[in-house]
């Protein structure tokens, strides 16, 4: 959340029904050929026009960059000066209550700092968003609509909010364990039990969100944080900048094109009204990555990537799939089904035998595998763009750049070409 022009923003939802923030201080299954007709002859069409924890003990080293610890380059100002610079941007009400410790992330219109409550010495994170910019305001409003309503162990918690005419300061719990993405890259192997433990926590959070009428719409390993660096850490869902929040009884269908290409559901690609089942598709992709270190759908060419997704075309060839249990594959298959009506719900996924048994029927051995070049490339680009050497984070404010987002224009062109082929 927070990159200035990197996201297609969601439509604003209706009024929310619950506010659990402590305080707000205002300014004084089926065959995967549902879209077979859509992707016919797509090969004849040219490519579509294209258009922060930072390092932790689990974050992979940046390729080609020597590990010199956290020593700042000579040109970098002293840490105290940097902290003072950002402290000056904070409303006096905030600094009277919280001691600004370090900048831990930034985006085009947001900054995230690690702070300490002056009275209790409890650490928190504060996200400062520049709401004078339209996109910053819209993303902020979207995230607040969700965070003011939720209280769940596996969802990032909002503590309080301070508002001025040009900025919003969101005080949030601090997660220090890094992203799931980083552990996937650095760890190199997971047992099936490891994977089911992660998925149980994420599914429980998603089930809770869906029961409230909230659809995340951008679930991926980068948006799943470990609460602390230990192996027994819980997982926290974060980054609700693209989320849709609706009251019970409202129309549950959404139309906004948004998300990250490799995790986007087929029905979004064809610009059909969709439901919260898009989150379940993304969880299928995440499960596949956890077990194999590769993505089920990946291609540098967006047209070919979208074609794979529309067909639900993925395979279990090569390592480590011969060592993966049939129950694990069945779990993935029931999520990566092109027909959203046949996809498992979060509750059904939690009750799947593989998850319930914590993969008891699997061999419990590490699934040794090489990480795909796609994931390594993404990790490398993120290393180069990381702005902080701290290992603490709350809610992401950067990481996803323009090239990693689904673009409305791309899908308009994709649909136009389909219509021309279909009508011709």
From Swiss-Prot:
Name under which the protein is recorded: Serine/threonine-protein kinase H1
Reported modifications of this chain: Autophosphorylated on serine residues.
Low complexity: compositionally biased ranges: 381-398
Function, as annotated: Serine/threonine protein kinase that may be involved in the regulation of pre-mRNA processing. It may phosphorylate components of nuclear splice factor compartments (SFC), such as non-snRNP splicing factors containing a serine/arginine-rich domain (SR proteins). Reversible phosphorylation of SR proteins may cause their release into the nucleoplasm and change their local concentration, thereby influencing alternative splicing.
Main location: Golgi
Assembly and oligomerization: Homodimer.
Top EC group: transferase
Listed Pfam families: Pkinase (PF00069)
Lipid-bearing positions (N-myristoyl glycine): 2
Entry's family note: Belongs to the protein kinase superfamily. CAMK Ser/Thr protein kinase family.
Residues in Protein kinase domain copies: 98-355
Chain coiled-coil ranges: none
Its membrane topology: Lipid-anchor
Record has Glycosyltransferase as a keyword: no
InterPro entries to which the protein is assigned, alphabetical: Kinase-like_dom_sf (IPR011009), Prot_kinase_dom (IPR000719), Protein_kinase_ATP_BS (IPR017441), Ser/Thr_kinase_AS (IPR008271)
Annotated positions binding ATP: 104-112, 127
Regulation: Activity depends on Ca(2+) concentration.
